[in-house]
């Protein structure tokens, strides 16, 4: 099935090259259709997948509801579902462990990859990371901040280079406790 999809993408890329006035047999673009098909397989690796399974929970001593676990500046690359252009940036995630459950730290960047390697918008990417962590951990709260640059803003349309978009997700104590939310945001500076 993947091979068939790649062949279709390659055909479509050759057609696009023709439609924009290029020659798909020209030396510089001769292998472009294969490269584009391979690129989509990589950057959209989790397209259509809905269940994140690549994690392990660890038992730890019961913690207070204000003990924050935070991972900051996790890089990501994604594709805008509106224009199929890249958006990229950093994700910071914090959670308040409950019931003696913590997640392996390497699993948080894997979750970011799982959510970002599909067509999306930043608002949904932010929400999905937070909701999945809530489902897995059932913590006292989750906070997610995503800062990203969007090529659909920078290279087309309004063409505003280096502009950044910030989105946040809060649940549990992060949503109800303004001081805790402030502490999370202060740690991001």
Swiss-Prot record:
Q: What catalytic activity is recorded?
A: GTP + H2O = 7,8-dihydroneopterin 3'-triphosphate + formate + H(+)
Q: Which GO terms describe its molecular function?
A: GTP binding; GTP cyclohydrolase I activity; zinc ion binding
Q: Does the keyword Zinc apply?
A: yes
- Cellular component terms, GO, for this chain's entry? cytoplasm
Q: Where does Zn(2+) bind?
A: 80, 83, 152
Q: Which InterPro entries match?
A: GTP-CH-I_C/QueF, GTP-CH-I_N, GTP_CycHdrlase_I, GTP_CycHdrlase_I_CS, GTP_CycHdrlase_I_dom
UniProt-listed GO biological process terms: one-carbon metabolic process; tetrahydrobiopterin biosynthetic process; tetrahydrofolate biosynthetic process
Top EC class, one word: hydrolase
Q: Which pathway does the UniProt entry assign to this protein?
A: Cofactor biosynthesis; 7,8-dihydroneopterin triphosphate biosynthesis; 7,8-dihydroneopterin triphosphate from GTP: step 1/1
PROSITE patterns linked: GTP_CYCLOHYDROL_1_1 (PS00859)
What Gene3D superfamilies does UniProt report for this protein, alphabetically? Answer: 1.10.286.10, 3.30.1130.10
**Per UniProt, what is one Pfam family of this protein?**
GTP_cyclohydroI
Keywords of the record, alphabetical order, are: GTP-binding, Hydrolase, Metal-binding, Nucleotide-binding, One-carbon metabolism, Zinc
Per the UniProt entry, the Enzyme Commission number(s) are: 3.5.4.16
Q: Which PANTHER family match?
A: GTP CYCLOHYDROLASE 1, GTP CYCLOHYDROLASE I
Can you state the subunit structure given in the record? Toroid-shaped homodecamer, composed of two pentamers of five dimers.
Family (UniProt): Belongs to the GTP cyclohydrolase I family.
Q: What protein is this chain from?
A: GTP cyclohydrolase 1
Q: Which organism is it from?
A: Latilactobacillus sakei subsp. sakei (strain 23K)
């Amino acid at each position: 099935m993947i091979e068939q999809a790649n062949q279709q993408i390659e055909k479509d890329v050759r057609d696009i090259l023709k439609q924009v006035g290029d020659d798909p047999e020209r030396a510089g673009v001769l292998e472009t259709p294969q490269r584009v098909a391979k690129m989509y397989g990589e950057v959209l690796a989790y397209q259509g997948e809905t269940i994140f399974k690549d994690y392990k929970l660890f038992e730890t001593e019961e913690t207070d509801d204000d003990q924050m676990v935070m991972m900051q500046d996790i890089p990501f690359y994604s594709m805008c579902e509106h224009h199929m252009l890249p958006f990229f940036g950093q994700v910071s995630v914090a959670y308040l462990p409950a019931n003696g459950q913590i997640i392996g730290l390497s699993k948080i960047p894997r979750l970011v990859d799982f959510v970002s390697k599909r067509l999306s918008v930043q608002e949904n990417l932010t929400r999905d990371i937070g909701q999945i962590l809530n489902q897995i951990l059932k913590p006292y709260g989750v906070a997610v901040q995503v800062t990203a640059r969007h090529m659909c803003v920078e290279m087309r349309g309004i063409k505003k280079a280096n502009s950044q978009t910030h989105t946040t997700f809060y649940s549990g104590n992060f949503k109800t406790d303004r001081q805790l939310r402030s502490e999370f945001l202060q740690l991001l500076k």
